[in-house]
């Protein structure tokens, strides 16, 4: 590969770690979750593949201290405020936030923080927990809203499950493969099938209970979130996902 890309990645990470002091705004938890996850993935890659030596100014112990500090001291407080608050958002927020909490736990080798994210996934009152975002039928908390947010919501749950899988925990299997059911439901809806069950959702906040029908906005506009679940359930585990497969082969 071209070492200049690695150098640029390190420049970006060091730049943020040395200057970022606060994340603020009305969507700050979502920003911290989504944008932070991209940063922490890059940091994880560089930390273990581009070490400092006599030839390149790669990852050093100083980088570990400063970049871990950024995630703990700038990102985590925003995420923690959301986690501890009374539920107030659609589930894609909670899923995005919790995914980043887990990622920080992994990156910083903080097992209690990682376990906190696992507990949120199973047990939180927030719309972003697994049982509150995906019903047994596969319907998603935001199915009555639009399809773009559904793809985001189920996608972040799959990414979280993949992070946990790398740590030896199988969250993909939780609640009888609930994530898989969500993907199959989402795929079937967006492929144009009409024989899909839909119920008015009673969400955790009480604010999003007025969607009477399937959300048609962004219908059939597929985002790149289907591959990760298909790879796990079909390629790793040998479980059929016929509608998700149709999405990927369309």
Language-model features: locations:
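Aromatic-lined, polymer-binding surfaces characteristic
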Residues: 1-168
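CBM-like carbohydrate-recognition segments
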Residues: 171-250
